[in-house]
């Protein structure tokens, strides 16, 4: 399935494809 956003941002970056940092949590683009 598609990766799920929601990890904590690390130095302003998200490592899950299609996610962006909405500090402090990654959100779907």
Swiss-Prot record:
Keywords assigned by UniProt, alphabetized: Cytolysis, Disulfide bond, Knottin, Plant defense
Cystine bridges: 5-19, 9-21, 14-26
GO BP terms in the entry: defense response; killing of cells of another organism
Keyword field contains 4Fe-4S: no
Entry comment on modification after translation: This is a cyclic peptide.
Cross-link Cyclopeptide (Gly-Asn) residue location(s): 1-29
InterPro entries linked to this entry: Cyclotide, Cyclotide_sf
Function recorded in the entry: Probably participates in a plant defense mechanism (Potential). Binds to and induces leakage in phospholipd membranes, particularly ones containing 1-palmitoyl-2-oleophosphatidylethanolamine (POPE). In vitro, displays cytotoxicity against cultured cells but no hemolytic activity towards fresh erythrocytes. Not active against Gram-negative bacterium E.coli ATCC 25922 or Gram-positive bacterium S.aureus ATCC 25923 up to a concentration of 64 uM.
Family as reported in the entry's similarity comment: Belongs to the cyclotide family. Moebuis subfamily.
Domain notes for this protein: The presence of a 'disulfide through disulfide knot' structurally defines this protein as a knottin.
Name of the protein this chain belongs to: Cyclotide mela-7
């Amino acid at each position: 399935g598609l990766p799920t956003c929601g990890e904590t941002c690390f130095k302003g970056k998200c490592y899950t494809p299609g996610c962006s940092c909405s500090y402090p949590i990654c959100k779907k683009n």
